[in-house]
């Protein structure tokens, strides 16, 4: 399997970057992962990296993005925080990935049976965790207002996990003028996804891609 290079990264579109990840997850679910020489990839990436996507996911030990999407060293950036919440550090990391390092896609990846989401639903208070869970509270309140309060507890948590992922995804473009500009120009795309810890499958939603502006398209074609 070929290691990501600047040339490969430059010619990828956001849509193609998404397709690579979707295909990788299908391989993962089918247990047909690509054969990679990881030591060779260590050597080939020692002088630089050209990842084509950045994935924001939870710290849950079952949700490692490189494994879920069957990617190797140097292929993707991985940002992880409980509840896949967006903060200034995450936004800064995404701005570096896309504006500086040239990544073409942002993925916000929630997952089923999320402990952080469950904690937010139960209004847990525990040290610094309290502030983190407060970032998930808007999703809890929105699901409650939509009639979700009458759902069984497990189903309510899953609804909140999905809504939280949607809200975090929208917050990225709302809070980062840099990323919003790249998106408007068609230089990056953004998608949401939910990973099933039962099946290993990622269900994607709210895929957002813009037609590249003429100048951006010409630059990518060079």
What residue ranges belong to the model's regions?
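Conserved functional hotspot residues or short segments at active or partner-binding sites
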Residues: 108
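Short helix-loop-beta junction
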Residues: 68-78
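Glycine/small-residue-rich phosphate/adenosyl-binding loop
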Residues: 50-52
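Long, hydrophobic/aromatic N-terminal blocks
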Residues: 38-41, 54-59
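Divalent-metal-activated hydrolytic enzyme cores
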Residues: 1-48, 74, 83-101, 115-222
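Acidic/His- and Gly-rich active-site-bordering loop/insert found
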Residues: 65
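Short glycine-enriched loops at secondary-structure junctions
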Residues: 57-62, 82-85, 111
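Short acidic/polar active-site loop segments enriched in Thr and Asp
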Residues: 104
